[in-house]
């Protein structure tokens, strides 16, 4: 696969500084990702911090229900022998969600291999499945490139309660959405093979299980481990850490408010809003995930239907850890207390929220790992590349100023010089009316006003004529406009980067599962954007 590395900027200050001016934000992180020494320091810190045997048992217990490639089994054995982990993760989106989920897994696998060689110590990739997330709007859709632009497939769930994705059954609504997706796709070369695997993944499964099956299908032969934080065994293992987070809730709240204020003073938009009185955890009630808050001496659910005294809640935490769920603020540090996380492969948003959690990690008695910025990418199909060449355009031009590109191309196609012609006409009319007003000034102010009003009506007619000329011009060049729209919907579908919208299974149905191996053959660098040319 041909590829090209380019630079695309970020609007958010913190991410931009993290990538190109790290010193300005270094105070918010424990390790500098751009300094190789950081990985040695992190490895030294991790020594003797975890129990490899217990970690192996934890992962094996979860993975025993899945068909595992030999490479996954080998990496589990490496965990047992003290391997470090490159971690990444995402909610279990529909058919893995947007492309960036795939890129996270790819980058974690690549970094694990690179860091193993750098440190001369085994490092394995692990994908954390955020099945506890209860926002159905995050996991109930996918987009793919349609004939007229982005096409959406949505799972029409009938149960809209705050049920974690890992407790939401895939059948029947998700299966119906898959069938709709299959029916809308052209008969691509690999379509049948791909949809056979998709249907196997979602058969008799919840969304978390189906996601895990798909990720293991795509990346198992490359050794990617997966783990679901909703697993009851993980709750039991981590109940002491969650209890510690509750006991130190006040200190965590103060730390968040402190960094929030500090980042605002530096002109950085904080990624997390501190929530006063939040317990930093949720309770599962009738399968719904409800936030817990402190109200005086009590712990209450946000819906007001559950209430504990402090002592009762501590007892509940001890007896029923599987009924509690950490929020993002404390989940990340709990992950680092359980897993020997050498580095975390983070997207732009994650870089932002990790930048608010350094002191939370310290309160919890640990450090955050090296935060590695995930590469970003654009898949460019042959037809897209052909259109770029036809208009002599660079992809970054479309990313940075599509509207400007659109108008420049239309101007190039305008051999009549419509803009210049009407500009000259308007200047000529304005000049003529100015001369007229000067010559007829003796007729008085009322006549001057009448002349001005008349000019306004004339210019309105000129504007109308110009708009009609532009309309005829666009219609005459409609095929070029359609190609420009095609380019936009490939690079900026829904006005977002391609990787944040389109789903990988459209491309797998067209180019085959070998596409994954091709991605893993590219030496991606952290924080860079790549143009990936499909063939």
Swiss-Prot record:
Coiled coil stretches, renumbered: 420-477
A molecular function GO annotation: ligase activity
InterPro entries (UniProt xref): Bacillithiol_biosynth_BshC, CC_BshC, Rossmann-like_BshC
Keywords, in A-Z order: Coiled coil, Ligase
EC number, as in UniProt: 6.-.-.-
Assigned protein family: Belongs to the BshC family.
NCBIfam families in the record: thiol_BshC
Job of this protein: Involved in bacillithiol (BSH) biosynthesis. May catalyze the last step of the pathway, the addition of cysteine to glucosamine malate (GlcN-Mal) to generate BSH.
Protein name: Putative cysteine ligase BshC
């Amino acid at each position: 696969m041909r590829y090209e590395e380019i630079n695309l900027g970020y609007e958010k200050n913190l991410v931009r500084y993290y990538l190109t001016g790290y010193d300005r934000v270094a105070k918010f992180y424990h390790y500098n990702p751009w300094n190789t020494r950081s990985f040695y320091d992190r490895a030294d810190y991790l020594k003797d911090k975890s129990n490899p045997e217990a970690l192996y048992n934890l992962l094996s217990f979860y993975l025993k229900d899945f068909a595992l490639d030999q490479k996954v089994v080998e990496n589990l054995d490496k965990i047992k022998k003290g391997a470090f982990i490159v971690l990444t993760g995402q909610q279990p989106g529909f058919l893995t969600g947007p492309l960036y989920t795939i890129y996270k897994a790819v980058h974690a696998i690549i970094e694990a291999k690179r860091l193993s060689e750098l440190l001369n110590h085994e490092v394995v990739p692990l994908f954390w499945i955020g099945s506890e997330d209860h926002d159905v709007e995050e996991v109930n859709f996918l987009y793919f490139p349609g004939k007229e632009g982005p096409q959406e497939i949505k799972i029409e769930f009938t149960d809209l309660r705050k049920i974690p994705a890992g407790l939401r059954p895939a059948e029947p609504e998700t299966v119906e959405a898959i069938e709709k997706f299959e029916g809308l796709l052209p008969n691509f070369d690999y379509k049948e093979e791909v949809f056979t695997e998709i249907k196997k993944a979602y058969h008799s499964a919840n969304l978390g299980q189906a996601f895990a099956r798909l990720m293991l299908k795509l990346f198992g032969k490359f050794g990617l481990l997966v783990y679901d934080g909703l697993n009851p065994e993980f709750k039991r293992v981590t109940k002491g850490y969650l209890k510690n987070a509750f006991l130190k809730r006040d200190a965590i709240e103060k730390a968040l408010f402190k960094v929030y204020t500090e980042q605002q003073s530096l002109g950085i938009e904080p990624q997390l809003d501190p929530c006063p009185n939040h317990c930093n955890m949720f309770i599962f009630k009738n399968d719904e995930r409800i936030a817990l808050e402190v109200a005086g001496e009590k712990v209450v659910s946000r819906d007001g239907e559950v209430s504990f005294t402090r002592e009762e809640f501590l007892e509940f935490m001890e007896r029923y850890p599987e009924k509690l769920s950490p929020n993002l603020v404390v989940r990340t540090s709990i992950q680092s207390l359980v897993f020997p996380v050498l580095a975390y492969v983070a997207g732009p948003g994650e870089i932002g929220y990790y930048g608010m959690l350094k002191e939370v990690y310290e309160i919890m008695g640990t450090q955050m790992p090296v935060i590695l910025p995930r590469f970003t990418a654009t898949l460019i199909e042959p037809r897209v590349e052909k259109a770029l060449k036809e208009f002599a355009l660079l992809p970054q031009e479309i990313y940075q100023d599509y509207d400007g590109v659109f108008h420049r191309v239309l101007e190039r196609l305008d051999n009549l010089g419509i803009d210049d012609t009407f500009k000259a006409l308007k200047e000529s009319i304005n000049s003529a009316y100015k001369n007229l007003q000067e010559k007829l000034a003796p007729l008085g102010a009322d006549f001057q006003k009448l002349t001005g009003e008349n000019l306004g009506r004339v210019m309105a007619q000129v504007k109308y004529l110009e708009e009609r000329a532009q309309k005829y011009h666009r219609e005459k060049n409609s095929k070029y406009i359609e190609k420009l729209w095609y380019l936009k919907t490939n690079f900026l579908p829904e006005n977002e980067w391609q990787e944040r919208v389109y789903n990988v299974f459209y491309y797998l149905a067209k180019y085959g599962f070998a596409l994954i191996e091709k991605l893993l053959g590219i030496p991606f660098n952290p924080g860079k954007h790549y143009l990936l040319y499909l063939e």
